[in-house]
Structures are given as structure tokens and as C-alpha cells.
Swiss-Prot record:
One of its GO terms (molecular function) is glycine dehydrogenase (decarboxylating) activity. CDD domains: GDC-P. Its EC number is 1.4.4.2. The glycine cleavage system is composed of four proteins: P, T, L and H. In this organism, the P 'protein' is a heterodimer of two subunits. Keywords: Oxidoreductase. This is Probable glycine dehydrogenase (decarboxylating) subunit 1. It catalyses: N(6)-[(R)-lipoyl]-L-lysyl-[glycine-cleavage complex H protein] + glycine + H(+) = N(6)-[(R)-S(8)-aminomethyldihydrolipoyl]-L-lysyl-[glycine-cleavage complex H protein] + CO2. It comes from the Bacteria. The lineage of its organism: Bacteria, Bacillati, Bacillota, Clostridia, Thermoanaerobacterales. The glycine cleavage system catalyzes the degradation of glycine. The P protein binds the alpha-amino group of glycine through its pyridoxal phosphate cofactor; CO(2) is released and the remaining methylamine moiety is then transferred to the lipoamide cofactor of the H protein. InterPro entries: GcvPA, GDC-P_N, GDC_P, PyrdxlP-dep_Trfase, PyrdxlP-dep_Trfase_major, PyrdxlP-dep_Trfase_small. Gene3D superfamilies: Aspartate Aminotransferase, domain 1, Type I PLP-dependent aspartate aminotransferase-like (Major domain).
């Protein structure tokens, strides 16, 4: 290999320092049956033109949202991304996910993060926001750890209507610290309030809620807030940022921490990533917040400047005592969210939310009119679930008509199968929705 950096002498020196005599001895823990005992037989090299054609042919095997009508839900949504978003992202000054440690050389990036934080605070109604998390699941898990640290309690309740993948991440994060995670069952598509009240006690650090929940249903968040705060625990809410164009901000119903996935804010579907997680909280929780915080200050000459602040919380300062181990964050994705929100504005976000709501309800009413039965009958935002005969057959039939819907509910809640999730955004037209209904019409 032409660019392997180690010389034979360096390899011998490294092996000697380890008390080894050969590369084979170094890798002796690898079973013989899985070792390749023949040449790798890689194809010969290609020119740049050939590589581009080869990659284009590989990419052409995949479908894209441009070639299909997308009704996919379960956490990733086909919202419109204004052209200006990607135009700004591709500027070389911004094109990195790394944290701008040198404030004197990074004022533009730091200001963009500060603007992002300001917008998320406006959306959620809370006091402080960090520079971003990896995604919605990691943001919710970090919120659980933060609640445990703040309350000095070791039990967290998570509603069974929270995205199953988010719940899985929470369980992974809390396994090491031995935090007890208890799932609260659902009833008719939202939390069973009686069971929740039974489970909340003086050892409960927080209740983790998703609103709208995984099924698209609106949770009774004000009642949940009352129950957890009566025991001096924290309310953690995972929200769809688009829904905040028309729903109450989390602060208004007493959320102490609000998190969510920012994919819908100017980030494409991209086969499930990369995303960003947003994380907002009350001001008094600032020193327990994970991730980076950008603050506004003045330099010695009185000029405005942006800096990373409260850094004593972070892993590059306190290592094992840090509030989290997040390092390189999702700054580029957060910039996309910033440009998106600045572009659509408050009125635009409200219009996007309203159109998503109205079009989802139009699709719902059309399907019910065709004889489909809803899995749940409560109020929903832009996503709902209908019962079907066979999930796989339905999704394959839709695929043949270049329609993507789902996933089937059996993937996450086998006890509710067979049923199909359908999400509708502002991008969908009446004709596209009518076509969906027409294709589904004979498969009730």
C-alpha cells in the first residue's frame, strides 16, 4: 500500500515494545477461520471520470424522496427544505461539525450557534439551549441523566408511547449509572394516567414524555406535569419542532427540559441521518446541561463577542466529572435549522404546521370514509395509524405506485399489528393524498 506511513523499522520497533515478534502474533486473537488466506483481489484503479460514473450507477439503485410520494413517519419527515439552506451550509466557513474552541477565529460560527440557541429558546419558551446534541434519542437520554443529577434520585419513568428507539437509547445511557427506568403503559394511544400516578413517587427523578407521541397522538401534558411536580420531579418532553408552530410551547405546561429531533428543520431524510438533537431547559439547570453553550460577551475594548461559556461542565475540562461526553456536536445540522427557521419565520412555521395538520386530517378522513379503522381516535398532529390486513403487502403495493408509507406498527408494537403509520407534511398535495387513498382503497 503506497501510503502506509510506517516503515519496516518502525513496525519492528513497535512490535518489540509490545514483546511481540511479528504482525501475525499481534493479531493472534483473531480466529484462523475468519482470516483471509488469499490475496484481496481488488479491482484495478479507476480514473476520476470512471469513479464518478461508478458511484452514480450505485446511487441510481436507491430510491429518493424526489422520485416517490413520501408518507413516511416514525420520526423522520419529508418537509420542504428551502434552497438557501444548503447554499449556506456549503460555504467553507461553516462546513464542519467541530466545536469552535478558538473564539477569536470563530466569531461567525459562534454567532450562528448563538442564533440557533435563541430560536430554540423562542420555540420552547425555555431559558437556555445548548449548541445541539446528536439526535432526538441522545437528547432525551441526556435529559434523563440531567434530571437524575439535579434531583439526586435514581428512577426515571418513560411513557411507552415515546419513540421505541428513543427509549432504547435511554436504557443504554442509564445502564452504566444503574438508573432504574420504568415504562408507563398506554391506554387508547396515550399514557394511562392512573398507572402513571401509581408509579410516581419521591424516588422519581423525571417523567419522559413525547408530545405528539410516537402514534401522533397528543398527550395530556398538563396533567402529567401536575402529577410529576407534585412529587418534586422534573418533566422532560420530547417535541416535534414543527408542531410548536401551533401547539403550546413546553414551558407553558411546565416542562423543565424540552428536547427533540431537529431533522424537520431544514435537514433532509438522508436514510435516517445525520440529524441534530435540540435541548432546552430552565435557567437554573444550566450548570447541569450537557453539550456546548455559546454566550454573548464583550472584549476588553468593549466590542461584542461570542464565546463558549460555562466550560467547566464539559469533558475537555473535567473529564470523568463532566455533565456529558459529547464532543464534536451537530453544528452543521444546527446551522441548517437556523437558516431554515430564519427563512420561514414565525408566520411561515405556523403555516407549515397548519398545512401539515390540515392535510393529515384530510387524509385521515378520506381513509376512514373508505372503511379504514383508526388504531386510536384521539387528537393528532400530522401522523396517525390505521388498521390494515397485511402490513407487508400494503407497503409493497404502495411502493409499486411510487408511494412510501409506514412503517408497519408491528416493527415496534407487535401487539397492535397489523396497522400502518401515515405521516402527512405540507409538501403533500390533494392529488397525492387522493392517489394514496385510491391505491389503499381495496385493501381494508
Amino acid at each position: 500500500m503506497k501510503y502506509t506511513p510506517h516503515t519496516p523499522d518502525e513496525v519492528r520497533e513497535m512490535l518489540s515494545s509490545l514483546g511481540l515478534s511479528s504482525i501475525e502474533e499481534l493479531f493472534s486473537d483473531i480466529p484462523e477461520e475468519v482470516k483471509l488466506k488469499r490475496p484481496l483481489n481488488l479491482p484495478s484503479g479507476m480514473s476520476e471520470l470512471e469513479v464518478k460514473k461508478h458511484l452514480a450507477n450505485l446511487a441510481a439503485k436507491n430510491g429518493s424522496a424526489d422520485k416517490y410520494t413520501v408518507f413516511l413517519g416514525a420520526g423522520v419527515y419529508d418537509h420542504y427544505v428551502p434552497a438557501v439552506v444548503n447554499h449556506i451550509l456549503l460555504r467553507s466557513e461553516f462546513y464542519t461539525a467541530y466545536t469552535p474552541y478558538q473564539a477569536e477565529m470563530s466569531q461567525g460560527v459562534l454567532q450562528s450557534i448563538f442564533e440557533y440557541q435563541t430560536m430554540i429558546c423562542e420555540l420552547t419558551g425555555l431559558d437556555i439551549t445548548n449548541a445541539s446534541m446528536y439526535d432526538g434519542g441522545s437528547a432525551l437520554a441526556e435529559a434523563a441523566l440531567m434530571a437524575v443529577s439535579q434531583t439526586r434520585r435514581d428512577k426515571v419513568l418513560v411513557l411507552a408511547t415515546v419513540h421505541p428507539e428513543y427509549r432504547s437509547v435511554v436504557k443504554t445511557y442509564t445502564w452504566g449509572p444503574e438508573i432504574e427506568v420504568v415504562e408507563v403503559p398506554y391506554k387508547s394511544g396515550t399514557v394511562d394516567l392512573e398507572k402513571l400516578e401509581e408509579l410516581i413517587d419521591d424516588k422519581t427523578a423525571a417523567v419522559l414524555v413525547q408530545h405528539p407521541n410516537f402514534f401522533g397522538q397528543l398527550e395530556p401534558v398538563e396533567e402529567i406535569s401536575r402529577l410529576i411536580h407534585a412529587q418534586k420531579g422534573l418533566l422532560v418532553v420530547a417535541v416535534d419542532p414543527i408542531s410548536l408552530g401551533i401547539l403550546k410551547p413546553p414551558a407553558e405546561y411546565g416542562a423543565d427540559i424540552a428536547v427533540g429531533d431537529g431533522q424537520a428543520l431544514g435537514n433532509g431524510l438522508a436514510f435516517g441521518g445525520p440529524h441534530l438533537g435540540f435541548f432546552a431547559a430552565r435557567k437554573d439547570l444550566a450548570r447541569r446541561m450537557p453539550g456546548r453553550l455559546v454566550g454573548l460577551t464583550t472584549d476588553k475594548e468593549g466590542n461584542r463577542g461570542f464565546v463558549l461559556t460555562l466550560q467547566a461542565r464539559e469533558q475537555h475540562i473535567r473529564r470523568e466529572k463532566a455533565t456529558s461526553n459529547i464532543c464534536s456536536n451537530q453544528a452543521l445540522n444546527a446551522l441548517a435549522a437556523t437558516v431554515y427557521l430564519a427563512t420561514v419565520g414565525k408566520k411561515g412555521l405556523k403555516e407549515i404546521a397548519l398545512q401539515s395538520l390540515q392535510k393529515a386530517h384530510y387524509a385521515f378522513e378520506r381513509l376512514i370514509g373508505e372503511g379504514y379503522e383508526p388504531l386510536f381516535s384521539g387528537p393528532f398532529f400530522k401522523e396517525f395509524v390505521v388498521k390494515v390486513k397485511n402490513e407487508e403487502e400494503i407497503t409493497q403495493k404502495l411502493l409499486k405506485h411510487h408511494i412510501l408509507a409506514g412503517p408497519g406498527i408491528s416493527r415496534f408494537y407487535p401487539e397492535l399489528a397489523p396497522a400502518l403509520m401515515i405521516a402527512v407534511t405540507e409538501k403533500r398535495t390533494r392529488e397525492e393524498i387522493d392517489n394514496l387513498v385510491e391505491v389503499l382503497g381495496g385493501d381494508r
